From Swiss-Prot:
One Pfam family hit: RecO_C
Protein name from the UniProt record: DNA repair protein RecO
Family: Belongs to the RecO family.
Assembly and binders: Monomer.
Source species, domain of life: Bacteria
Keywords: DNA damage, DNA recombination, DNA repair
NCBIfam families: reco (TIGR00613)
Keyword tRNA processing assigned: no
Keyword Ribosomal protein: no
A cellular component term, taken from the record's GO annotations: bacterial nucleoid
Amino acid sequence: MEGWQRAFVLHSRPWSETSLMLDVFTEESGRVRLVAKGARSKRSNLKGALQPFTPLLLRYSGRGEVKTLRSAEAVSLALPLSGITLYSGLYINELLSRVLEYETRFSELFFDYLNCIQALAGTTGSPEPALRRFELALLGHLGYGVNFTHCAGSGERVDDTMTYRYREEKGFFASVVIDNNTFTGRHLKALEAREFPDVDTLRAAKRFTRMALKPYLGGKPLKSRELFRQFMPKRTVKTKKD
């Protein structure tokens, strides 16, 4: 791919004494593995640009699995992520690295990713809504089609107060049992609309996306989730004094 295209670095690691091995997500080619020769040398002007969450324009060449980076320019400064939003950004980067095949085009997903990073950078509240919307978009692009609005058993529209159990590749079926794998009709409508007005619908969305993403991730845990658990401060619960 000799032409310029928009991209983000998902992950980088040292490669030889002066180079970097990059995992990048591009608009036209999807996920691509690149060697950035000399990027670690003192004279390189690429050091600051080849960082996660920095919008890039880049060119590369090569026919094998690992391509060679020819040029890269930062379109702007890195989007400002810190604390909980930084860990959230690292999570979606790792998610893409785990589930996307190399060199499969996902142009619409690229903009879903950009929108998610921008939402994380601009949020003053919880990052959870942005993460859930991105996960649902990713599942859709992977071909994971789900009908949230109709019961797969009866064909009728879901009812807010009824409970439904999800069966993989079949849909949601009415259930009299309530457990961690069931959802109310209200939850399903929130998932369809990608709108999560309260903690209850957010938790339901998280349960569903974890369930749906599990086959793509296999048994290997995400490192970013473990980092989040280790380094983010625990929330303290304030109690009223008598």
